[in-house]
UniProtKB/Swiss-Prot annotation:
Basic and acidic residues composition-biased segments: 192-206
Keywords, comma-separated and alphabetical: Chondrogenesis, Developmental protein, Differentiation, Glycoprotein, Osteogenesis, Phosphoprotein, Repeat, Secreted, Signal
Source domain of life: Eukaryota
Gene Ontology CC, one term: extracellular region
Gene that encodes the chain: Chrdl2
PROSITE patterns reported in the protein's UniProt record: VWFC_1, VWFC_2
InterPro entries: CHRDL1/2, CHRDL_1/2_C, VWF_dom
Compositional bias (Low complexity): 207-216
Phylogenetic placement of the source organism: Eukaryota, Metazoa, Chordata, Craniata, Vertebrata
Protein name per its UniProtKB record: Chordin-like protein 2
Summary of the tissues where the protein is detected: Weakly expressed in the liver and kidney. In reproductive organs expressed in connective tissues such as ligaments of the ovary and oviduct in females, and of testis, epididymis and certain male accessory sex glands in males. Expression was high in uterine myometrium. Weakly expressed in cartilage of the femoral head, patella, articular facets of vertebrae, in the annulus fibrosus of intervertebral disks. In normal cartilage, expression was confined to articular chondrocytes especially in the superficial zone.
GO BP, sorted A to Z: chondrocyte differentiation; negative regulation of BMP signaling pathway; ossification
Location(s), subcellular: Secreted
Residues carrying Phosphoserine: 182
Length: 426
C-alpha cells in the first residue's frame, strides 16, 4: 500500500450512498444533468467534488441519455512491484520501470473535451459528436496521449425493461448479478490498468510468453481500429483524429484526416499494394513501394500482403502493412524515445538507443500531406543525449530486424560529407 493512498471505507461508502440519490433528484430528464450546481450533457463524465474532501478521484460519474447521473467507485488492479508510485489527480498507484531514466518518467497527458478532463487510457461517451447517428448507435471515445479518439458503436437491443451501462462501452445491458459484480472491475482494468503502459515491455506474463504492447508499429503510431470490449457490440471503425479536418468516405467506410487504408475494389477485393490517405476530405492513393533489402536471405510472399516478409515474421502477421512489435530481443535490442511535448514545427523526433553502442540515433520525421517522411538522421553521444533526457520519454522497444525493414520502406537517404549526419531533401 502506498502511503497517503488509503481511503477510509466508511467515508467512501457515505460518498457512494449520497451521490446517486442527490444526482438523480437534481437531473433534468432527457436533456441535461445537474450535479453540484454544474450542468452536464448526456455522455459527459467527471470526478465529483465534495466538501470538505475535494475532488474524489476514485469515483466517476456519467450523465446518461435520460438525464440521470450514474456514479460508481473505481477499483485499483493489483500491482506486481515493491515500490509503486502515486501521481496527482489519480485514483490508483502504478509501477515504474526501474530501467527508465528518471528524466524520462513524464506523466501521460490527459484530454479535454466539453470542459471535461479525461485521463490517458480512459473510455467515455460523447454523443454530441455524431448528431445524425441512429437510435441504436452511441459514441465511444478514448483518451490516448492527450488526443481524443471517438467512433460510432452499434449496440444490441436489450431484451429487458431495466438496463445498465456496459463497462468499457457506451451501450446498455440488462441488469443482472453478473453485470453488477463485474462492472467496476472491468472498467477499472481499462481505465487504470496497464493496457496503455508507458513502457510496453515492462509487463511479464510468463517466462516464455512475450509481453504485449499497446502500440502497433516501431514508432508507436495509433492503430486504425480501436478495439472495444463491449458485449456483442460492433467494433469501432471510425476514428476522429483531428476534429477541424474533413473526413473521407470510401466503400461505405469513413476515414479521418491523416488515416491510411488499403482500398477495396468490388471486382478484385482488397488491394494490398495500393495505399490511400485521407487529406482533409480528399483521397490520395498510391502504389506501395516494397523494400529492396530484407533482414533475412529468403523472404516469402504471403497472401494478403503486398511485400514479401521474412519467415520469422509470419507468426506476428496482424493483416496490416505496419509491422507489429514485441518486446526487445537480445542481441540487437533497441529502446525508442519520443519528445514528451509536441513539437511546434510539425516535426516528429524519435531517438533510437542501442544498449551496445555509445551513441544514439535521432530520426526526424516531417508530416507532408498526411504522410510521414524521414528528413534527417543525427548521431549523438549518449552522454550528450542525457542532457536532453528530461525532454523525452520512453515510447516502446523493438529490435534490429524490424527497424531495418521499417527504414527500408522510406525514401532513399543520401549521406552528406559530415559523418555525423544523414539528410534528405523533400
Amino acid at each position: 500500500m502506498v502511503p497517503g493512498v488509503r481511503i477510509i471505507p466508511s467515508l467512501l461508502g457515505l460518498v457512494m450512498f449520497w451521490l446517486p440519490l442527490d444526482s438523480q433528484a437534481r437531473s433534468r430528464s432527457g436533456k441535461v444533468c445537474l450535479f453540484g450546481e454544474k450542468i452536464y450533457t448526456p455522455g459527459q463524465s467527471w470526478h465529483p467534488y465534495l466538501e470538505p474532501q475535494g475532488t474524489i478521484y476514485c469515483v466517476r460519474c456519467t450523465c446518461s441519455e435520460n438525464g440521470h447521473v450514474n456514479c460508481y467507485r473505481l477499483r485499483c488492479p493489483p500491482l506486481h512491484c515493491s515500490q509503486p508510485v502515486m501521481e496527482p489527480q489519480q485514483c490508483c498507484p502504478r509501477c515504474v520501470d526501474p530501467h527508465v531514466p528518471s528524466g524520462l518518467r513524464v506523466p501521460l497527458k490527459s484530454c479535454q473535451l466539453n470542459e471535461t478532463t479525461y485521463q490517458h487510457g480512459e473510455i467515455f461517451s460523447a454523443q454530441e459528436l455524431f448528431p445524425a447517428r441512429l437510435s441504436n448507435q452511441c459514441v465511444l471515445c478514448s483518451c490516448i496521449e492527450g488526443h481524443t479518439y471517438c467512433g460510432l458503436m452499434t449496440c444490441p437491443e436489450p431484451s429487458c425493461p431495466t438496463t445498465l451501462p456496459l463497462p468499457d462501452s457506451c451501450c446498455q445491458t440488462c441488469k443482472d448479478r453478473t453485470t453488477e459484480s463485474s462492472t467496476e472491475e472491468n472498467l477499472t482494468q481499462l481505465q487504470h490498468g496497464e493496457r496503455h503502459s508507458q513502457d510496453p515491455c515492462s509487463e511479464r506474463r510468463g517466462p516464455s510468453t512475450p509481453a504485449p504492447t499497446s502500440l502497433s508499429s516501431p514508432l508507436g503510431f495509433i492503430p486504425r481500429h480501436f478495439q472495444s470490449v463491449g458485449m456483442g457490440s460492433t467494433t469501432i471503425k471510425i476514428i476522429l483524429k483531428e476534429k477541424h479536418k474533413k473526413a473521407c468516405t470510401h466503400n461505405g467506410k469513413t476515414y479521418s484526416h491523416g488515416e491510411v487504408w488499403h482500398p477495396t475494389v468490388l471486382s478484385f477485393g482488397p488491394m494490398p499494394c495500393i495505399l490511400c490517405t485521407c487529406i482533409d476530405g480528399y483521397q490520395d492513393c498510391h502504389r506501395v513501394t516494397c523494400p529492396t533489402q530484407y533482414p533475412c536471405s529468403q523472404p516469402k510472399k504471403v497472401a494478403g500482403k503486398c511485400c514479401k516478409i521474412c519467415p520469422e515474421d509470419e507468426a506476428e502477421d496482424d493483416h496490416s502493412e505496419v509491422i507489429s512489435t514485441r518486446c526487445p530481443k537480445v542481441p540487437g535490442q533497441f529502446h525508442v524515445y519520443t519528445l514528451a511535448s509536441p513539437s511546434p514545427d510539425s516535426l516528429h523526433r524519435f531517438v533510437l538507443e542501442h544498449e551496445a553502442s555509445d551513441q544514439v540515433e535521432m530520426y526526424i520525421w516531417k508530416l507532408v500531406k498526411g504522410i510521414y517522411h524521414l528528413v534527417q538522421i543525427k548521431r549523438v553521444r549518449k552522454q550528450d543525449f542525457q542532457k536532453e533526457a528530461q525532454n523525452f520519454r520512453l515510447l516502446t522497444g523493438t529490435h534490429e530486424g524490424y527497424w531495418t525493414v521499417f527504414l527500408a520502406q522510406t525514401p532513399e537517404l543520401k549521406v552528406t560529407a559530415s559523418p555525423d549526419k544523414v539528410t534528405k531533401t523533400l
